[in-house]
C-alpha cells in the first residue's frame, strides 16, 4: 500500500492525522474509487468531475486541480508493477485530498457470482442524492453488513424499484435486450455502467434505461453487475434463482469479452492521461 498525503508519498505507518481532522472525517469524507488499465488511470477526468460534484454538495474546496490530480495518480501507479486500485478521499472543511494506492487483485469471476436482495431500502433522493459519494451513507453501510456468502446485495427503492448494488450497478437481459435502472430510479451514474451502455450500443445490442421492478430480475434471462474494479461481473444466482450453471449467457459473455478493448480505445476515458 502506498499513500499520498500533503504533497508526499508515504507508507501507511508514516501517516498521522491530527484529531480535529480525524473527528471531521467521521462526519463523512467525499471519495472516489479508480483503477488502472495497462497501468494507466482509467477515466480520471470523469472521476475528478464526480469528486468535485460531491464536494459541491458541501461547498467543499477541492485543493487539487485536474492536472495535479492526474500527476499524483500516474506517479502512484508507476510505483507498482501491476494494475492498481486507487481510493481518493476529500476531507470535510479543509478540502485536503488523500490517495491510497493498492494492488488490484481480482478473483476469477467468469464462473459468475451470487447476489441477494438487500433488506435495506435506498435512501430517498430528497434525503441524500444518489450522485453524492460519501463515506458513512447509512443505507450503504447497513447493506454491506448483509454481504455474507454473496458477492453483493441489491438495494431497492421505497416503491420496490431496483436501484443498485452496495458497490455496483445492475443490468439484466431479457429476450436479447439489455435493461438497466435509469438514473431517476435513485442510482449513481456509474462510469463503468456508462461504458457498458456505450459498448452495447456499438455492438447493436438494444438498450433500455428505465424503472426496473424487482420481479423483473427473477424473470430475466441474464443478469450482471458493473463496477470500477472488476468491470462486468456475471450473476450466476440471485437469492434462490439460478441464471446459469457453467457459462454466462450470450449477451453477458459478449460484453465481458469486448469490455476491456472497448474502454481502452474510447478516447474520453483517457482525457489528461
Curated annotation (Swiss-Prot):
<comment type="pathway">
    <text>Amino-acid biosynthesis; L-isoleucine biosynthesis; L-isoleucine from 2-oxobutanoate: step 4/4.</text>
</comment>
<keyword id="KW-0100">Branched-chain amino acid biosynthesis</keyword>
<dbReference type="GO" id="GO:0009097">
    <property type="term" value="P:isoleucine biosynthetic process"/>
</dbReference>
<dbReference type="InterPro" id="IPR018300">
    <property type="entry name" value="Aminotrans_IV_CS"/>
</dbReference>
<keyword id="KW-0663">Pyridoxal phosphate</keyword>
<dbReference type="GO" id="GO:0009098">
    <property type="term" value="P:L-leucine biosynthetic process"/>
</dbReference>
<dbReference type="GO" id="GO:0052656">
    <property type="term" value="F:L-isoleucine-2-oxoglutarate transaminase activity"/>
</dbReference>
<dbReference type="InterPro" id="IPR050571">
    <property type="entry name" value="Class-IV_PLP-Dep_Aminotrnsfr"/>
</dbReference>
<keyword id="KW-0028">Amino-acid biosynthesis</keyword>
<dbReference type="InterPro" id="IPR036038">
    <property type="entry name" value="Aminotransferase-like"/>
</dbReference>
<comment type="similarity">
    <text>Belongs to the class-IV pyridoxal-phosphate-dependent aminotransferase family.</text>
</comment>
<protein>
    <recommendedName>
        <fullName>Probable branched-chain-amino-acid aminotransferase</fullName>
        <ecNumber>2.6.1.42</ecNumber>
    </recommendedName>
</protein>
<dbReference type="GO" id="GO:0052654">
    <property type="term" value="F:L-leucine-2-oxoglutarate transaminase activity"/>
</dbReference>
<dbReference type="InterPro" id="IPR001544">
    <property type="entry name" value="Aminotrans_IV"/>
</dbReference>
<dbReference type="Pfam" id="PF01063">
    <property type="entry name" value="Aminotran_4"/>
</dbReference>
<dbReference type="GO" id="GO:0052655">
    <property type="term" value="F:L-valine-2-oxoglutarate transaminase activity"/>
</dbReference>
<comment type="pathway">
    <text>Amino-acid biosynthesis; L-leucine biosynthesis; L-leucine from 3-methyl-2-oxobutanoate: step 4/4.</text>
</comment>
<dbReference type="GO" id="GO:0019752">
    <property type="term" value="P:carboxylic acid metabolic process"/>
</dbReference>
<dbReference type="GO" id="GO:0009099">
    <property type="term" value="P:L-valine biosynthetic process"/>
</dbReference>
<dbReference type="InterPro" id="IPR043132">
    <property type="entry name" value="BCAT-like_C"/>
</dbReference>
<dbReference type="InterPro" id="IPR043131">
    <property type="entry name" value="BCAT-like_N"/>
</dbReference>
<keyword id="KW-0032">Aminotransferase</keyword>
<comment type="function">
    <text>Acts on leucine, isoleucine and valine.</text>
</comment>
<feature type="modified residue" description="N6-(pyridoxal phosphate)lysine">
    <location>
        <position position="133"/>
    </location>
</feature>
<keyword id="KW-0808">Transferase</keyword>
Amino acid at each position: 500500500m502506498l499513500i499520498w498525503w500533503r504533497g508526499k508519498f508515504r507508507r501507511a505507518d508514516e501517516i498521522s492525522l491530527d484529531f480535529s481532522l480525524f473527528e471531521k472525517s467521521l462526519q463523512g469524507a467525499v471519495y472516489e474509487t479508480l483503477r488502472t488499465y495497462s497501468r494507466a488511470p482509467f477515466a480520471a477526468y470523469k472521476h475528478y468531475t464526480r469528486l468535485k460534484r460531491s464536494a459541491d454538495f458541501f461547498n467543499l474546496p477541492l485543493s487539487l486541480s485536474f492536472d495535479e490530480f492526474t500527476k499524483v495518480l500516474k506517479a502512484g501507479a508507476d510505483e507498482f508493477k501491476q494494475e492498481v486500485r486507487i481510493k481518493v478521499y476529500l476531507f470535510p472543511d479543509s478540502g485536503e485530498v488523500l490517495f491510497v494506492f493498492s494492488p488490484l487483485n481480482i478473483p476469477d469471476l467468469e464462473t459468475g457470482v451470487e447476489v441477494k436482495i438487500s433488506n435495506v431500502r435506498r435512501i430517498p433522493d430528497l434525503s441524500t442524492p444518489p450522485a453524492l459519494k460519501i463515506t458513512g451513507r447509512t443505507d450503504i453501510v447497513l447493506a454491506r453488513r448483509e454481504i455474507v456468502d454473496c458477492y453483493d446485495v441489491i438495494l431497492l427503492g421505497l416503491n420496490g424499484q431496483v436501484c443498485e448494488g452496495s458497490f455496483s450497478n445492475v443490468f439484466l437481459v431479457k429476450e436479447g435486450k439489455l435493461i438497466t435502472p435509469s438514473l431517476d430510479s435513485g442510482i449513481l451514474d456509474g462510469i463503468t455502467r456508462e461504458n457498458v451502455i456505450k459498448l452495447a450500443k456499438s455492438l447493436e445490442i438494444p438498450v433500455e434505461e428505465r424503472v426496473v421492478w424487482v420481479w423483473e430480475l427473477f424473470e430475466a434471462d441474464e443478469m450482471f453487475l458493473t463496477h470500477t474494479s472488476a468491470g462486468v461481473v456475471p450473476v450466476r444466482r440471485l437469492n434462490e434463482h439460478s441464471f446459469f450453471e457453467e457459462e454466462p449467457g450470450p449477451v453477458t459473455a459478449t460484453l465481458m469479452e469486448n469490455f476491456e478493448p472497448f474502454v481502452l480505445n474510447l478516447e474520453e476515458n483517457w482525457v489528461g492521461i
